[in-house]
Amino acid sequence: MSTIELNHLTFTYPERSFSLDVEDKHFADPMVAIVGQNGAGKSTLFKLLTGLLTPQTGVIKIDGENFNDLKPVEKLLKVGITFQNPDDQLFNPTVQREVEWSVAQVMDDHDTITRRALAALKRVGLDDKTA
């Protein structure tokens, strides 16, 4: 089971007065619910946990490793995110190309990327959506 530690974590958006200040939180349960009102910082927290945003202060540790020190590919192997609104997530014209883009973040052989993307789509029943 993985553990997530958040120590004195802060992030402030420049365009608005918002601050997420998390102090010494440890999550080791198999399932944790993050709840709060709109604008409370749930999405910001997950963007910090996936490396889409970088905290101004504090440390994120996953399984004892400082997440901020990991390379982008190492972060991708530890944490993933699916956005509520797919328009915020998908950039490629087809499902296959979107999955290939994700695979290409951890390898560079084109044939292997295509093969792995198609296998992933087949596993989730989307292999008919490749065009």
Kindly give the residue locations of the regions a language model identified.
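Short helical segment in ABC ATPase nucleotide-binding domains corresponding to the A-loop/adjacent helical element
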Residues: D87, P93-Q105, T114
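Conserved Walker
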Residues: S43-T44
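The feature captures the beta-strand-to-loop junction immediately N-terminal to the Walker
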Residues: V35-Q37
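Helix-to-loop junction immediately C-terminal to a conserved catalytic motif
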Residues: T50
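ABC nucleotide-binding domain signature
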Residues: A33, V73, L77-Q84, P93, ...
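Conserved ABC transporter NBD signature motif
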Residues: G58-N68, K75
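Conserved ABC ATPase "signature" region
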Residues: D111-K129
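A short, flexible loop at the N-terminus of ABC-type nucleotide-binding domains that lies
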Residues: M1-E23, A28, D69-K71, H110
